[in-house]
Amino acid sequence: MPWSGIPGLIALGAVMTGAVAPPALAFDFYAGKTVDLIVGNSPGGGFDIYARAVAQHLGHHIPGNPGIVVKNMPGAGGARAGHYISAVAPKDGLTIGAVMPGTIMGPLLDEKPDTSFDPANVDYLGTANTGTYICVTLDRSKTKTFEQALSQKTIMGGIAPGNSTNDIANLIKTMTGAQLELITGYKGTLDVALAVERGELDGVCGWNWSSAKSQKPDWMASHKLNFLAQIGLEPNAELTSLGAPEIWRFIRSDESRKVAEVVVSQQAFERPYFTAQGVPSERVAMLRAAFDATMRDAQFLADAGRLGIDVSPLPGTQLQEMIQKLYATPKAVLEQAKRAIRP
């Protein structure tokens, strides 16, 4: 089946291979030039902060050492930035982009997808992180395990349809029968966390683990969370050590698992970077090699540590293959996935 190889691609991507060296003439291209990094989100958010950390180091690994300038272009759930990079900007390798995984999944799962950007027709440089969602309650909640959530009402907070806090909660409810009640409309995960602290909610599902650690370090330090489940294509060692079971334990049928994998797969490319198709292949190779080198750069990793952001990359060639497989998913499976996240 087209989607069955995605978990294996992640495991394979954990060992990054060296890129093929581009022709010698390509090394002269970037000298004295500036590369625009278009971010499909507003300034100041977690996605923007991450992109700026990458930008500080990426140019050092591109032959010719071009400058990297971050430009924010929010709108249409990231599709505005994607459209600009893929259809408007010159296809010369001087424009790259960073959009949310939801932007890539939108054409597959949105009820009314934005058709101005086709994520299957760009060249991916890689993803800086492969993340994991968590489904958690605060320690005072009566629901302390997933087994308890199967039999008693548990109130979870969400932001909006299309956001993981809504979609993952609905997916879990649909696929496992968990008695989750979703209250939606919060402005962000910090607002959800505040509502949990006020006692309005039991917890949240679909919270990115990396974001949770940076947004609520006090909860982590004081062990205030009950980890009902971790949601990802591969287990997260840190979460496993904290006792968080994989959601797949509670999704029994093969059919349900295949549907759930489509939705969960976006965690495999949490911080994707790309350029337009049509950029000369040798420049794409250079950008991919530079991205891989940045992910291994000791100074970048130190900066990431100070910022509290996780780095768990996959190279561009494997991200490309993963997204091609996703876009080959049978329509019937996609329709089931849509119904699961928006019941």
Task: Name the predicted role of every residue range.
Residues P101-P113, N166, N170-M175, R198, ...:
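A ligand-binding cleft/hinge motif common to bilobed small-molecule-binding domains
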Residues L37-A51, G75-G77, G157-S164:
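Extracytoplasmic "Venus flytrap"
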Residues G32-V35, A221-L228, F250-R252, K258, ...:
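An extracytoplasmic/periplasmic, membrane-proximal ligand-sensing/linker region
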Residues F29, V35, H60-I62, Y84-T95, ...:
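Hinge/capping helix and adjacent helix->loop/strand transition within the periplasmic-binding protein
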Residues G5-A19:
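Bacterial N-terminal signal peptides
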Residues V20-A26:
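Sec/Tat signal peptide C-region and signal peptidase I cleavage site
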Residues A98-V99, I159, G185, C205-W207, ...:
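Short beta-strand and adjacent tight-turn residues that come in two discontinuous sequence segments
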